[in-house]
Design a protein with these regions (language model features):
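Nucleotide-sugar donor-binding and catalytic loop/hinge architecture
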Residues: 1, 192-212, 236-238
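N-terminal strand-loop element at the rim of the active site
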Residues: 7-14, 27-65, 77, 175
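Short His-centered aromatic/hydrophobic patch
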Residues: 88-93, 100-102
Length: 240
């Protein structure tokens, strides 16, 4: 198949969606598909040599307008092309397939409020979001994606995301596909996991019976590090 991917930036070293897209491109190319990438920037060295790149130039714009600029530029660039299928990730619309790696923005915004312990603060923050141009712009774009005239095939990454589509946009589970995010099995080797576990515990003077949690990431408040630490405190002293 001749497949077009649309995503503003594909720099796999940054992680997240960009890493997943690169992995998916490699797998599809290995299976013999012709991949086209419509993007503003990319790391060609991290992608198969068979990929055909299409530069999508964007003028400067405020943050809340950038997704609109890229989405519009992609649709313009795709005109006249003869791809079998076009695939968009996150903030694009009007394509054959939408595969939102970050789930729904509406759900994310609501869940973000839970990082505030005080219910009153949550209400205040939610109220001020009604005046946030970026917030309102992203909500409007999301409604265009899933409730607009062009009906795309929507792929959810989990049951939770599928439920969010039903809750926020009344999109039936029957109208969605479910494809869970899969890790490249060649990226991490598990054969020496126990050996590494022993070595690092010895280096850090951690007893083999001690319960240990490893957090790797940014924005620890949003990712839930604080509740994890509180949970560790509540564990029985001799817990396995």
């Amino acid at each position: 198949m001749d497949i077009a991917f649309c995503y503003e930036s594909v720099l796999p070293k940054r992680g997240g969606c960009e890493t997943y897209i690169a992995s998916l491109v490699r797998r599809l190319a290995l299976d013999g598909h012709q991949i086209h990438l419509y993007a503003s920037r990319w790391d060609a060295s991290a992608l198969p040599t068979s990929v055909i790149f299409h530069q999508v130039d964007l003028p400067w714009s405020p943050r809340f307008m950038r997704p609109w600029s890229f989405g519009s530029a992609c649709l313009k660039a795709l005109k006249g092309q003869d791809h079998d299928v076009s695939v968009g990730f996150d903030k694009t619309w009007g394509l054959d397939v939408l595969y939102p790696q970050g789930g729904l923005f509406a759900a994310t915004a609501e869940h973000n409020l839970l990082k505030y312990k005080n219910p009153t603060i949550r209400k205040v923050v939610k109220f001020f979001k009604t005046f946030d141009l970026s917030h309102q712009s992203f909500l409007m774009l999301e409604r265009l994606q899933y409730l607009g005239m062009k009906k795309s095939i929507v792929i959810g990454i989990s049951e939770m995301v599928r439920d969010h589509f039903q809750k926020y946009y009344q999109i039936s589970a029957n109208d969605l596909r479910l494809v869970r995010i899969a890790m490249d099995p060649n990226r991490f080797q598990e054969t020496d996991r126990l050996k590494r576990r022993i070595e690092w515990r010895q280096q850090w003077n951690i007893d083999p019976s001690d319960c240990l949690a490893l957090f790797v990431g940014m924005n620890y408040r949003l990712k839930g590090l604080e509740p994890l630490l509180h949970a560790m405190k509540l564990l029985p002293e001799k817990s396995p």
